[in-house]
């Protein structure tokens, strides 16, 4: 499980994002006949407390200018759409875990606002 452009002699797992590295670390904990399906939904420069909502369409997902996370915002709808599509693709696919990495774009907001908004998003994701 390595990115095709990774130089294994240098200990590289992947060259884009953290997904391949995380998947490689999870492999010892899953059955030998199972696999890991990555559903990337990240958006550079996104945040909960700042940014543009953008738009969403079922055909193309969140628009390029969507940079704000939150319940029912375009990035959230994109997350749900991608996750449901991955689960529907194969009846054996099961949602096992979500890895969330938040960047520094929420630095200007208050921790209380961020925690509340993230908690609401997690609750909604579990319900959807």
Sequence positions of predicted segments:
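Cell-envelope and extracellular/periplasmic
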Residues: 1-128
